[in-house]
């Protein structure tokens, strides 16, 4: 009888460890790049509305084949312009990439105290703090001037070496000619 209780306690303990892993999986975004996958742990506890919108866009395939239109070495790589950033065909407008968003509404700012450092994923926006929509950026390094000014939505937990290989832009704005792209973006897989 005592052995049965120990086995049952062990099974219950194993089940309690399995539950959080499943919850974390629902907030895992995988970005497939030409050099390999990048896994981002999304943080709905910091930015629930932003994370919800990213998940919705990813689940609809809206981020697939979208270019990294602005990449500044030593700063960040920006992507997610689903309106203008599609690679190939008529949907790719290099002169307009970075100017759009998605068909979904803009999201009010959800600023936090989480610092912008290497691997942090933040939402891009215009001058208005409440203008984030679909575009996001991945930090190459720490950048304190962004802290509390932009919404943090996640952090790269693996594949940062693949982010480092994204083709860099030129000039002060980091516009990229013949840019790399997100081949496929999935959430919870």
Predicted segments with their positions:
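Cyclophilin-like peptidyl-prolyl cis-trans isomerases
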Residues: 3-6, 10, 16-189
